[in-house]
Swiss-Prot record:
Main location as per UniProt: virion
The protein, known as: Tail sheath protein
Keywords recorded for this protein, A-Z: Host cytoplasm, Viral contractile tail ejection system, Viral genome ejection through host cell envelope, Viral penetration into host cytoplasm, Viral tail protein, Viral tail sheath protein, Virion, Virus entry into host cell
Complex formation: Homomultimer.
Location within or outside the cell: Virion; Host cytoplasm
Family: Belongs to the myoviridae tail sheath protein family.
UniProt organism field: Bacillus phage SP01
Biological processes per GO annotation: symbiont genome ejection through host cell envelope, contractile tail mechanism
GO cellular component, one term: virus tail, sheath
Its job: Polymerizes as an extended structure around the baseplate-tail tube complex. During ejection, the sheath shifts to a contracted form, thereby making the inner tail tube protrude through the host cell envelope.
Underlying gene: 9.1
S-S bonds: none
Pfam families (UniProt xref): Phage_sheath_1, Phage_sheath_1C
Length: 571
């Protein structure tokens, strides 16, 4: 039975797990988490790619190869390279395919083949099994006709050749298989077949002989024997996969085989197009297409995918949908993650052609310092050569990519973006832009030279003019600083002895951690560090002046008539 009085109460919740925990006080920020790692995770649809797990990419090319088309590869292109000059975005992005992709399969010739590519693309793969170049072996071919990708493996099954080079007139080899597992290799030699004696015995259950490579090396070390590999691809195959052999002549070169094991091993290790599972007796078959691959449908709820993110370290979440229900799920996830010591920010957007009033309505439903609503829809050169509008959730992805491409304390206000046009004419100075900004909508605008820029990097929080709650960069900096202090204290002190010098040691660690943030220009300064040690608890309070963006430059230009008080001479 759980005892609910264990642990401590802090910041409105009960803490049982030992560690360093924190809260952020923003009460002193009027007009005046965890720590960000600049790693976004994006949830959306794709033509291919395995659903139900986080896939990681460092560039858009690999993503397009694996995901095909759809929202995800399009968004990744914009997240990796949001700036007009190229680049300027995320360096690593996690992806979750929301639609339930299904790989194509085919079961034939005693083998089940499954496309490595999830989705309809696997239906374009054909497989074939025929006799190999070495008698008794097989040759496997997989071909994808639209990309002309080819996997081909010859001499499958023939893993090693063995020959007896001694003076005996007869030499044979046995491979003993017990319950489907090869357990022993034994050679016998003699003057005739009726008078053979055991010459060598290898216990394959001994780790010394656990692979084909190890067996071959041992045989080559023994006089009167020679062995060679058929292909280096099979060197690491377990010797326990060898097929049974009884009395096979080795006076001339003979082959040890492992047809089932070698087929599964080589294809699983080296094939790009398919995976295999041997289901019965392996026999040849002609070219056969895989079938049943589907893009799949997208569920109405993405809660299962959000649960996957709880096991990842990420500070930026993008959901590629205009569904307000999914936006609400994602925001609830982000709020929950703050209590799990993984502070995150959510970036979302609406659909195509939405009016400003609709965007304002969406922002009001979120109203959080951890949620960013982007507007309007956009035209990007990579999507139908810039001739078709992308929904505003792509705008959110692009802004998230830029946020991931700069330090946490760097504002993204007035950053320019690599776009052809906007889905709605938003010109600098339009009154509706002011209305959007004051309503918590992160808005793009077009300036005189045709460039497109972000008006202000803001969250959907609508309340006091508190930059920690309103500004993306200040919110992320607070997360970074708070988590850095908490993590450093946890790593340094939790589980250690509390002694007379503990308070001063904690003060020093906090001071050193904050001083580093001053050096990196994440904060302006810090002070008032207070540490209290009571029983098993250490209470730490401190104050930090965070770096805030310069949003307004107010210039008074005074023009007066010339009455002789000004000099006209060059200095």
């Amino acid at each position: 039975m759980a005892i609910n009085q264990y642990g401590v109460n802090f910041n409105g919740r009960r803490i049982v797990h030992p560690g360093a925990y924190g809260s952020i006080d923003d009460s002193a920020m009027v007009v005046t988490s965890d720590g960000s790692s600049n790693i976004p995770i994006v949830i959306g649809t794709a033509d291919s790619g395995k659903s139900g797990e986080v896939l990681w990419y460092t560039g858009v090319e690999d993503a397009r190869n694996e995901l095909g088309g759809g929202d995800l590869p399009q968004a990744l292109e914009m997240m990796f390279s949001p700036s007009p000059e190229g680049g300027g975005g995320a360096s690593l992005v996690g992806v979750i395919v929301a639609n339930k992709t299904v790989p194509a399969t085919a079961t034939i010739g005693g083998v089940k083949f499954t496309a490595a590519e999830y989705g309809e693309g696997g239906n374009k793969i054909q497989v074939k099994l025929e006799d190999g170049s070495i008698p008794g072996s097989k040759k496997f071919t997989a071909y994808k006709w639209d990309t002309q990708d080819l996997d081909t493996f010859d001499n499958i099954g023939s893993v090693m050749s063995v020959a007896y080079t001694g003076t005996a007139k007869v030499a044979v080899i046995d491979v003993v298989v017990t319950d489907g597992v090869a357990t022993k290799i034994e050679t016998k030699v003699g003057e005739d077949a009726e008078n053979l004696t055991v010459d060598l015995q290898l216990d394959l259950t001994n780790e010394r002989y656990s692979t084909i490579e190890a067996v071959a090396q041992y045989l080559n070390s023994v006089s009167d024997y020679s062995a060679s590999y058929v292909t280096s691809m099979s060197l690491e195959l377990e010797s326990s996969k060898l097929d049974a052999i009884t009395g096979q002549d080795i006076k001339t070169k003979s082959y040890l085989t492992a047809l089932k094991g070698d087929l599964e091993f080589r294809i699983s290790q080296y094939a790009d197009l398919v995976d295999v599972e041997v289901t019965g007796e392996i026999v040849n078959f002609d070219n056969t297409y895989l079938s049943g691959g589907e893009k799949g449908t997208t569920p109405a709820s993405w809660s299962d995918y959000l649960d996957l993110i709880k096991k990842q370290y990420s500070d930026i979440l993008v959901v590629l949908t205009d569904s307000e229900a999914i936006h609400a799920e994602a925001l609830a996830h982000v709020q929950q993650m703050e209590n799990r010591k993984q502070r995150q920010m959510l970036f979302v957007g609406g659909g195509k052609g939405e009016a400003p009033e609709r965007a304002i309505e969406r922002a009001s439903l979120l109203n959080s310092s951890r949620a960013v609503l982007a507007y309007p829809g956009i035209y990007h050169s990579s999507y139908y050569s810039g001739s078709r509008e992308l929904p505003a959730y792509f705008t959110a992805a692009m802004i998230a990519g830029r946020v991931a491409g700069v330090s946490q304390s760097t504002p993204v206000t007035f950053n320019k973006f690599n776009l052809v046009s906007l889905g709605r004419d938003m010109l600098a100075g339009d009154p509706e832009i002011d209305q959007l900004i004051t309503s918590g909508v992160c808005t793009l605008e077009k300036v005189k030279n045709g460039a497109i820029r972000l008006v202000q990097g803001i969250t959907t929080y609508i309340g006091s003019n508190n930059t920690l709650l309103r500004e993306i960069s200040v919110r992320r900096t607070a997360d970074l600083v708070a988590t850095s202090v908490e993590q450093t204290l946890e790593d340094t002190f939790v589980g250690k002895k509390g002694v007379s010098t503990t308070v001063s040691s904690v003060e020093t660690v906090v001071s050193d951690t904050l001083a580093e943030k001053v050096r990196t220009e994440d904060i302006i300064g810090y002070g008032d560090i207070k540490v209290t040690f009571k029983n098993t608890m250490i209470y730490v309070d401190y104050e930090v002046a965070v770096v805030e963006p310069m949003n307004y430059i107010l210039v008074r230009s005074h023009f007066v008539p010339d009455t002789g008080q000004f000099t006209t001479e060059e200095v």
